[in-house]
A protein has these predicted regions:
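Short alpha-helical segments that sit at the start of domains
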Residues: 1-21
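Short acidic, hydrophobic short linear motifs in intrinsically disordered regions
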Residues: 20-34
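Short amphipathic alpha-helical interaction segments
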Residues: 36-52
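A short, conserved structural fragment
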Residues: 51-61
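Minor-groove-contacting beta-hairpin "wing" of winged helix-turn-helix DNA-binding domains
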Residues: 62-68
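Short, amphipathic alpha-helical interaction segments positioned at domain boundaries
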Residues: 69-83
Length: 83
């Protein structure tokens, strides 16, 4: 998955969690938000690289959530983009 796609997924996690860390979002909701529907033949989402960078984490129930580091990273990215 491209870096651009991963950043898009971080934005989706932000929106669906209302900008809160540790709020689980089901992968199906992430898929829907990025335009991947039921039966999509593309490669399944691999969010591990976001976890490897401590920006998101997989919760025990199988959902994904932003970490506090992910929240801080997104806020900084948005501040820099506004300049």
């Amino acid at each position: 998955m491209s870096r651009r796609d991963l950043m898009h997924i971080l934005d989706v996690l932000w929106r669906l969690s209302h900008g809160q860390a540790d709020v689980g979002v089901p992968v199906t909701r992430i898929d829907d938000a990025i335009g991947r529907g039921h039966g999509d033949m593309r490669t399944p989402l691999n969010l591990q690289s976001l976890s490897d960078e401590s920006l998101a984490m997989r919760l025990p129930e199988g959902t994904w959530a932003l970490t506090p580091q992910g929240i801080a990273w997104l806020k900084e990215d948005r501040e820099l983009s506004d300049r």
